[in-house]
């Protein structure tokens, strides 16, 4: 009997470390899941500096000014469209780069840049901190980070931007917004104005979102059969 008891207790002995390892593993996995949930919550609630809700985009061009005006009027007239505008790209896709120089032509740094229609920042919920939108090719708006990189202090308006051979006047300052994903550091940014509608068309839909997106793609295919107009979120 005593031999059997010692044998049984011996068999139980090796289970205790195993049980500890199992509990430690479960605790580690739970902790990891908690961290992931916190990161997910952070991403969902992080201020992007613009409002992407119910915004869909399609990359397409409409040719001459008459066709552009027709397309813009068409999209604005759809009952399930809240607002529409266009730009070179969407913030999450990032933007092209341009080299910034000083007065002597010495390269300073690379800045992101984008051409936008005048109503685009308002449509996207971007904030113009001071000044106004550019109105011609000799004017630009910059973000806060651009001013910081240039060491301009708080006086940003009426400064001169030397942009890859172009000499432009700063007429507006836009609040920093997220360019690319959350792993990308905040980049300097130049905003230029365009009157052309197309390239990256942005549409903010009304609810119900999924149903209205299907409607939008259907009527777009019918209205522009010679083009690929595929809106996506």
Language model regions located:
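Alpha-helical transmembrane segments of integral membrane proteins
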Residues: 1-61
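Short secondary-structure boundary/capping segments
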Residues: 9-10, 47-50, 131-133, 153, ...
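Membrane-proximal extracellular/periplasmic loop immediately following the first transmembrane helix
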Residues: 41-108, 113-114
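Hydrophobic secondary-structure segments that place a key small or acidic residue at a functional site
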Residues: 110-187
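Residues that form or immediately flank small-molecule/cofactor binding pockets and catalytic motifs
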Residues: 9, 63, 89-91, 133, ...
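Well-ordered beta-strand positions enriched in small/hydrophobic/aromatic, beta-favoring residues
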Residues: 56-58, 100, 140, 161, ...
């Amino acid at each position: 009997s005593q031999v059997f008891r010692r044998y049984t207790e011996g068999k139980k002995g090796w289970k205790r470390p195993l049980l500890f390892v199992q509990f430690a593993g479960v605790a580690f996995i739970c902790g990891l899941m908690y961290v992931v949930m916190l990161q997910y919550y952070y991403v969902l609630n992080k201020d992007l500096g613009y409002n992407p809700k119910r915004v869909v985009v399609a990359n397409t061009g409409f040719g001459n000014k008459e066709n552009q005006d027709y397309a813009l009027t068409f999209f604005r007239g759809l009952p399930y469209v809240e607002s529409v505008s266009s730009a070179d790209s969407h913030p999450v896709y990032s933007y092209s780069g341009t080299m910034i120089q000083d007065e002597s032509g010495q390269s300073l740094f690379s800045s992101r840049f984008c051409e936008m229609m005048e109503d685009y920042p308002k449509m996207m919920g971007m904030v113009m901190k001071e000044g106004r939108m550019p109105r011609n090719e000799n004017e630009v708006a910059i973000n806060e980070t651009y001013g910081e990189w240039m060491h301009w202090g708080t006086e940003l308006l009426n400064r001169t931007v030397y942009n890859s051979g172009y000499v432009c006047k700063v007429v507006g300052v836009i609040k920093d917004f997220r360019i690319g994903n959350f792993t990308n550091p905040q980049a300097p940014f130049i905003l230029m104005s365009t009157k052309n509608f197309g390239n990256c068309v942005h549409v903010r839909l009304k609810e119900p979102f999924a149903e209205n997106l299907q409607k939008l793609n259907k009527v777009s295919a019918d209205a522009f059969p010679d083009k690929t107009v595929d809106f996506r979120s």
